[in-house]
A protein has these predicted regions:
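A cross-kingdom marker of C-terminal helix-rich interaction/assembly modules
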Residues: 1-269
Length: 269
């Protein structure tokens, strides 16, 4: 049984050569990505242990999530699954915005809890409605109790609200990052939009559709890596500043110098 791309798609073991070629074609993008990833993993080990305010504990978890999403995005990007990589870049950016909010914007813990309670309320109401429609006879008391609890905490005129990512990004000084690494990937990667679907259309020089395609893609890998790297460099800076990692200050400054050069090269390619 063969295990190439034509047999099992992006699970194929013949994508190693594709990955090597992509990394050779875009060395600057992957060089700084690899450097930042190693720095992030070292930071995880070097962050001092001990009690922290809840906001910092949540921010640390957010950093873990951002780094994991970054690593996952790079794995997919180098294998040519760009739409999925861009979805993970957006998720990485979302985590970075939350980290920034938790560390720099008062009231973010409460907003995060409110967002959670909105989800709990929606899920409980959905389970009640689904069971009633299906006449399952299931005990709905746990769901009804959750609804009552949330409504008691948030009266009718003050229902729990979802997090507003654009607003939080602006408050945390991450407005430009939001546009680059959250809004743009949302349009052609994170959601099944018209732009995302057009990735599977083969077009001629005039832009006319001539067939369907399903294969590794590197068409906008440069912008994908730009958005991913921008997200992580902000995350590293926040963690270094707020998590007692003074020993990384010089390394962060040097990283920013490399990023200033790499970013300009990527933006003009």
């Amino acid at each position: 049984m063969t295990n190439g791309f034509n047999d099992i798609g992006f699970f194929g073991d013949d994508l190693d050569s594709w990955r090597d070629n992509v990394r050779a074609e875009f060395p600057e993008s992957f060089a700084i990505a690899d450097r930042m990833n190693r720095m992030g993993m070292r930071m995880i080990r070097d962050i001092p242990e001990g009690e922290r305010p809840l906001s910092q504990g949540l921010a640390l978890a957010g950093f873990y999530r951002a780094l994991q999403s970054f690593q996952s995005a790079i794995l997919l990007a180098e294998r040519g699954a760009l739409a999925e990589a861009r979805a993970l870049v957006r998720l990485c950016c979302e985590a970075v915005i939350l980290v920034g909010g938790l560390l720099k914007v008062e009231g973010t813990v409460e907003k995060l809890n409110e967002d959670h309670e909105k989800h709990v309320l929606s899920m409980a109401n959905s389970m009640i409605e689904l069971n009633r429609q299906a006449k399952t006879g299931a005990d709905l008391t746990p769901f009804e109790s959750e609804v009552a609890r949330v409504k008691a905490e948030y009266p009718e005129e003050q229902k729990p609200a979802s997090l507003k990512w654009a607003s939080m990004a602006a408050q945390a000084g991450l407005g430009r990052l939001f546009e680059l690494s959250y809004r743009l990937p949302s349009g052609d990667g994170a959601h099944v939009t018209l732009s995302a679907l057009h990735r599977h259309f083969d077009k001629d020089k005039e832009g006319e559709i001539v067939g369907m395609i399903f294969h590794p893609d590197k068409s906008d890998l440069q912008s994908t890596m730009l958005a991913a790297n921008a997200s992580l460099i902000h995350a590293l800076g926040l963690v270094q500043e707020f998590m007692d990692l003074g020993q990384y200050e010089a390394e962060i400054r040097d990283l920013l110098l490399q990023w200033s050069v790499t970013r300009k090269e990527l933006e003009h390619e």
